[in-house]
Amino acid sequence: AALVQKALEEKLGFALALTRGEGRKGDVILEQCPQMGKEDYILTVDAENVRITGGEAGVWYGCQTLQQMVEQCGAVLPVVKIEDGPDIPNRGFYHDVTRGRVPKLSFLKKMADRMAYYKMNQLQLYIEHTFLFRDFSEIWRDDTPLTAEEIMELDQYCLERGIELVPSLSCFGHLYKVLSSKGYSHLCELEGADQMPFSLRGRMHHHTINVTDPESLEFIKGKIREFMPLFTSRQFNICADETFDLGKGKSRAAA
């Protein structure tokens, strides 16, 4: 309610007081209905008040619709009844924070605000090396990585806006920055990974981890152990895609 109060104040120029109990004439009334779907809501505007009734997340989504109405109509809203709910349960955005500039926490929060406004409910940040792994400093030391504290703060920020922040960590293919480093190049499927000239195509098509080396699994598990506890999500995206070199080098005999 406080988040909605602040958003409406920015659009209307005056603050609506928060309280609990029975609604009165002129109030914006928010009420949960356990019988409704979790993300469903009904928004009604009549001569008496504005009422948003919905499931646990539905009330929040109804508030986003109310904000959009205020942007269009100002303080004088039309009489209306809106019944709404999603057809798609997971409405997410996948954002690459590895190839290119690493965004600041303030930017990621603005992204979460915009996602909430459009009733999106899942955010994944694609990471190869742009997290400050305490045990693997060699892979991020030339960058400005996201920290554990920033991830936890963003996770809480997303939760408050109905967004699940899902960890997404590259664990198999195109580990360019990792497998071109001196300390970990021996884990690459192809020989001489640290000597390959940089190219965008090469970055995507090579630098697959060698699955036949037991050290590879321990390295990946170590990254996951450090990264996973920072999130409240029960999901984890290991990004095991685009392993173009698999079976073409050190693992050829096992392929």
Task: Identify the role of each PLM range.
Residues 89-255:
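Substrate-binding cleft of carbohydrate-active enzyme catalytic domains
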